[in-house]
Amino acid sequence: VGDLPSDLFSVVGFTLTERLSELFHGCLELASTNPDVGAGEVLEQQVDLVVWQDGVPLRRFTGVVNEFARGDSGHRRTRYELIIQPPLWRLGLMHNSRIFQTQTTDTLVRTLLEERGIANSVFDLKRNPQEREYCVQHRESDLAFIERMAAEEGWHYRYQHGSVDGDEQPGLVLADHHGDAPRLEPAEYNGKAGGSTQQPAVFRFRYEERVRAASVAMKDYTFKNPAYALMHEQSAASANQRQDYQHFDYPGRFKADASGQPFTDAKLDALRNDASTAHGESNRADFTCGAKAVLTEHDNPTLNRDWLLTAVIHTGKQPQAMEEEGGSEPTTYHNTFSAVPADKTWRPKRTHRPLMDGPQIA
């Protein structure tokens, strides 16, 4: 934790939830022989947590402390609890109203991130965003504004915690595709293990399908050519539902065909981002949202395919950290995860724009 001694805290347990296009949230239960650790020494400090197995580092989690709690003291140790989130969390505390003119969305987002000290960000975009003549952040946080713009463009974001060897540093990734997603080792399914196996495996896997919008139509108006039908449509082929479920929207918030079709495609993907999903449990510490892995050895061969992880909840327990107060329970790690077929493009749903009460006087 920050510049504090690395042996000051022992990890009793942790839970960390990460999802695409959401801030991850980690809760660390710690113990220390020092009963006098104060909030001022911990809040806003960088945290580095490494999961080990048999002396081998498996996974690294990094974040910033935004909550601190001191618990009870036992015979020799005092309990503490820390909440960690990515540095991007700070933008949720910064509320503003401003106007951006003649800028592309990636330039706009880069400006906000750099102003707030988020330097390690990567834009992995296949499509060059169109210039926005006029774009307003209105009575909303910097984070809400960035998430709104990203969803409109069809971008998702994820946080890289960094590698255990230090070759890959923590950072924010914004992307409009999953082609460069981290590739994990194949995940072997072992439903009979019931979570008791020490070998890396997926021991629960549930596949689901849902009826969702089958097509999207978006229309807007251009004063340059009022008679022109500025309308774009996109449909999704699905054999398991009716095809007449159309989502129509006006205005589509685009001024030209160059942005109208991508906006329409992105909206359909977002409305269908949970049409085909899977949920499971595993002991694979390397599972991280935004990564891809092939499932193997499942008794249903159609599920032995490539999957994109969209959410992972990591849980670890190490009661021995409390020594004489810890009992005889073993050290454990497991996770629950959500995934979609890797040939689908997962995109976040759009949020509503803030409403303006009336004319604003400059």
Report each predicted region and the residues it spans:
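Amphipathic alpha-helical and helix-coil boundary elements used as assembly
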Residues: 1-362
